[in-house]
Amino acid sequence: SDLQIQNILSHRIAFISISGKNKISSYKTNINEAQWVAHISAIIYHRITKKESFVPEKHLGIITPYRSQIATIKKELGNTGIIELLSVTIDTVERFQGGQRDVMIFSCCVNAPFQLQFLCNTFKENGQLIDRKLNVALTRAREQMIVIGNSHWLERDTIYRQLIEYIKDKGAFFQI
């Protein structure tokens, strides 16, 4: 509901857990996540355009690990009917390095546990476990970060579990 989305957008960082059956045409796409990305993008667009012109390079960016999910998200953004959203950069974490946006949406697109190996890039530094890809994804957001994914699978990874627990403690975890 729009009220739920307003609540989601009131947090600096939020996690939307998409559970249930994904209409899987491939493990590298998640239509439910793509639809949520598009819906939230449209609401963010309308919020911004009440105050100023929408500038995609400044206001909004979308990160996802797979090219096929990029295409799925683009299709769903097109379905919103908001032409400006088609100019929003949607790319992989690696290709988004160096670019920041006011709001970043991260579609994790993990449909099975084996995909965590591809999503995660962990190493130890000074006794601390660090995920380079997640770190880059989180630091692209100037004002707000929205993570969309299946928490059931993501929580199998130590760092994602810690992130989800942190977000739950902030009251910004939403089960859809």
Predicted regions and their residues:
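Short acidic low-complexity segments
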Residues: D2-L3, T89-F96
